[in-house]
């Protein structure tokens, strides 16, 4: 049995799982690897800030085994650097102390865009370091990053950069849903939302922290939908505080119909399950070259209508192409009018799509086993590394 450590960096025992997606990425990968024969995964915290891991609130540590990296490093056969990464200097020091694991850099975000924006816009004195370690045996990255990052990763890390299947699991959505329902909240599913078209509430969940995940395209879509006769109650922009404090932004949108009629509002950032219980009927999304995201899968898993431009799930939800805002507006209008008469078909279609990202996709699980095996015996398994979005696996 080979031991695989997946890095996380905890800020405190009280840290929420829902602050950002990176801890979820680690947990999803943990669940998958523990389904693979011959491998056992643990989560390894590199922060040094937690004294008692049994007290962390992020997850149940009897299910998600979490250890101090520095206490278990020499026991690892594979180190997957996911939430946190080490410099070459760090790795050399670990090796002097007996560390001998295979090292995989696992990238879950669009690092090219994130790092370039950091160089251009951040305060150079406060900007966090960019770890371009060349101590990795391989770089793995999820499919939606391929366009911007394949060559970038290979060059900066001076090793093979391999696209790997996207991993998702409804574990935490189910857990949070159960917690809310046990405390007396409404059942978290679309059947408990507003019934009449003119009462439908639209929401977007883009974090508005870079150009990839930004709400301006959605404002354009909702505005045009209103102009062509779509009926709805309002459109709420989650994580919109910074935008709506920007004078230039407010002056710009003041000419829009959704602003004049008081239909656009903003909220803070919330766990998606919590806000879906109270304030949402339709979810609309636009992300730039990011055609897979937990947001899409979570929303559809809970049965909510999703209007999106994610071409790797164009066979689910309500899809519009790329930056075609007017097309998105027509798709939104049609969904508002017809979705409630199409619930069963919508759910069945989405269920088939969702399963290709979970450990029910046995081909994907087997591919991850082959990837791990090949770290120890290069070439043991022949893999094409040509990703097919329709199967979430290699061709």
Q: Where are the regions a protein language model picked out?
A:
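N-terminal subdomain of nucleotide-sugar transferases
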Residues: 1-47, 221-231
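A short, charged/proline- and glycine-enriched loop
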Residues: 1-5, 9-10, 75, 193-202
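Conserved catalytic-core segment of nucleotide-activated headgroup transferases in glycan assembly
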Residues: 18-25, 151, 157-258, 262-263
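Catalytic binding pocket for nucleotide-activated donors in carbohydrate/polymer assembly enzymes
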Residues: 278-358
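Donor nucleotide-activated moiety binding/catalytic core segment of transferases
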Residues: 67-69, 243-302
